[in-house]
Amino acid sequence: MSAASLRLVDTPMDKQKALDAALGQIERAFGKGSIMKLGAREAMAETEAISTGSLGLDIALGIGGLPRGRIVEIYGPESSGKTTLALHAIAEAQKAGGTCAFVDAEHALDPAYARKLGVDVDELLISQPDAGEQALEIADTLVRSGAIDVLVVDSVAALVPRAELEGEMGDSHVGLHARLMSQALRKLTGSISKSRCLVIFINQIRLKIGVMFGNPETTTGGNALKFYASIRLDIRRIGAIKDRDNVVGNQTRVKVVKNKMAPPFRVVEFDIMYGEGVSKVGELLDLGIQAGVVEKSGAWFSYDGQRIGQGRENAKTFLRNNAAVAEAIEAKVRANAGLVASAMMGAPESDGDAASPD
């Protein structure tokens, strides 16, 4: 073929015809919508978010909450608030008319506590599977139905492979749990994206043996979930909240360790009160100070020139009893979300795990 004919084929019109033919062939083979321009559909261009129940965490995540159609991992030590955070997300989704499911592999969900957090337990679907394979098959079926808005798996550590359940105590099953998670996530990822379902995996922490330098902590289930998760949240209890001698809640810190939707490494702190969940009025005080909306002078908190309480607990009580003031502070905090988010930036953590999901 001559050089002239090659140049003739290389015109923009010929390229467009070749591209149209290729796109038509792909759509005939795999169905309409199997390939498109990124901005062709509004649903593809913008990611919907489901609130976490924490105003500060919604701001830290950059998109107003947890993204639909993505995988989220929440991990931390025992009794740090992992399940509480997941139940708050379920409650927020239900308020918006969504349908939610909870795969309780730990067999430890308390309906009374879930109800106190605002979860409609009469409408919440719950499964308590016997084996890890069963739990993940149930999750896959629910996601593929396209009818579920939020699915929580509690927890990855409790997804015991059937071979381990049927074996003897002390039998070695090296890598079985990691292979189960890797296979399940490969299967789930596509259907999660198509169904616009938010899938939250709750995970536990383990210590790596023989680590002399760096962070010795790791999560269960291998490396696959670290790769497939769009957002990873590290939640820790950093202190106790006391009423005289009684502990009535925990001070909690959440770090956005990974975020594919916005800048990561933001850190937010809030109170988790026993029987109540995330303290919204406590958050309003903290975020209000960061946004310059609430003033703190000594032990006194003031808003708009008016003193609202001496001491944090008294100020929280004032906001709890004066909903109009609380709403006004929240509106101003949301208006100054960029300023608040910039104050949340933390340092990245080094993670020595760099293996492929297989």
Curated annotation (Swiss-Prot):
Belongs to the RecA family. One of its GO terms (biological process) is SOS response. InterPro entries: AAA+_ATPase, DNA_recomb/repair_RecA, DNA_recomb/repair_RecA_CS, P-loop_NTPase, RecA-like_C, RecA-like_N, RecA_ATP-bd, RecA_C_sf. GO terms for cellular component: cytosol. ATP binds at residues 76-83. Can catalyze the hydrolysis of ATP in the presence of single-stranded DNA, the ATP-dependent uptake of single-stranded DNA by duplex DNA, and the ATP-dependent hybridization of homologous single-stranded DNAs. It interacts with LexA causing its activation and leading to its autocatalytic cleavage. Keywords: ATP-binding, Cytoplasm, DNA damage, DNA recombination, DNA repair, DNA-binding, Nucleotide-binding, SOS response. It comes from the Bacteria. This is Protein RecA. Gene3D superfamilies: P-loop containing nucleotide triphosphate hydrolases. Its main location: cytoplasm. It is found in: Cytoplasm. SUPFAM superfamilies: P-loop containing nucleoside triphosphate hydrolases, RecA protein, C-terminal domain. GO terms for molecular function: ATP binding; ATP hydrolysis activity; ATP-dependent DNA damage sensor activity; damaged DNA binding; single-stranded DNA binding. It comes from Rhodospirillum centenum (strain ATCC 51521 / SW). The keyword ATP-binding applies. CDD domains: RecA (cd00983). The keyword DNA repair applies.
